Amino acid sequence: MFKYESIYNNIKDRIQMADLQAGEKLPSIRDLSQQFTCSKSTILTALNKLEDQHLIYAIPKSGYYVVDHQMPHKPSTTDFIDFATSSPTWHAFPYKDFQHCMNKAIDTYQEELFHYGTPNGLPSLIDEARKLLETYQIFTHSDHIFVTSGVQQALAILSLMPFSNHRKTILVEQPSYHLYMDFIKTYKLPVIGIRRTVNGIDLEELEQIFCSHDIKFFYTMPRFHSPLGTSYRKKEKEAILSLAARYDVYIVEDDYLADFEQNTKVDPLFSYDTHNHVIYLKSFSKIMFPGLRIGFAVLPPLLTPLFQRYKKTTDIDSSMISQAALELYIKSGMFNHYRARVSGTYAARATILQHALRKHLSVYQFPSEICMHSHIVLPKRVNLNLLISHLNQHKVLLEPIDGNYLDGVLNERILKLNISNIEEYKIEEGIKKIAIALNNSKNYF
């Protein structure tokens, strides 16, 4: 056995025996070389192997720390099966790791905290963002990346600022992201809806809208649409981009669930764009936690200066502490490690949901995608409000779809499903209860 392997095993055993706690700093390389009577390069080899195994992580100019590997079970405080909540499971996040990054961020950026930042965001985070975005097949220059206070802020700025095509009307899928629907209604923005279903959108209708209306941009979720859970195929993406280029319409791509993609061959719309007509939005609210309030926006060159000006008048800069902590979290490799682990957890839940739908609700239409969001298309004779109320009384929580539509748009009979906050063993039980309720004539008109 080589010397570095002996050191690796020693430290690994101490971590597994909890002699070294999650978040605890390892002795310095110099101290370890003295402890094990070996060269610093031997210690570095052992530490690199521990890092490769995701047992420790490095923070520049600080040292090596033990990764928090705990994924505690959620306390069973309720008997409800919650298909309504879309926020991530709070107990799954390794708080100790991120808390350490927060503390380190305050130490590292003491002076910067007393100055206003830049409209684009913390430069060191933007550099990490550029490298991270490349793993999603988003290749761009750092000058076109903005750190925003969540995707919601990016959407607000894009909705209010003028575009180079000098148009005003926004096109949105129906149904769509409920908070953006609220924003459009509140500000009374000119808007048109296009129906999206399990089968996607009608491309002929899309062309007709692009051709006959002054469409500023088309807001879309090509991957794992909220609330439907559906995704566009490659041919649909290419067709949408072709029409956008022909009619000079920008595409706002909300890729909020990119981190949960299990198929490495699926790329975002942005990666197919050759005419600089796609604005890419990346969120951390699902993969980490909504309270972080950090998102990335990638702008085409023509829109970059104006977006920067509008963002500066909105908040000058997003939270410096959150930005600095996220930079360290990404740079240390902890984000990639956590992303791989938690996306696998949600994929397992989504697979159980898909199997349960096929087993108990096969007579209804639902998407085939393995996603934490899904839905069931119900017959028109189903009274959706009565059905939801009935299921709530039987401890199955569901949310009406009304908020995902614009005013005046005929709502589909769609039952939204989200498994973000349901334990695996409860998913099929919940679907069975829905199937039983649909067999009850009291839930029909």
Per-segment meaning from a language model:
Residues M1-A105, E111-G117, L125, R130-K131, ...:
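N-terminal basic, amphipathic alpha-helical segments
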Residues F83, I251-V252:
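Residue-level marker for buried hydrophobic side chains located in beta-strands
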Residues E112-Y247, D259-F260, K265-Y272, Y346, ...:
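Conserved core of the PLP fold type I
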Residues I145, V249, V278, V363, ...:
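Short, conserved active-site loop motifs that form the nucleotide-linked donor/cofactor pocket
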Residues V172, V252-E253:
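Hydrophobic residues in beta-strands of the RecA-like P-loop NTPase core, especially within AAA+ ATPase
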Residues I279-K359, Y364-F366:
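PLP-dependent aminotransferase class I/II
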Residues F284, D402-L406:
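Short, solvent-exposed loop/turn elements at beta->coil junctions and helix N-caps
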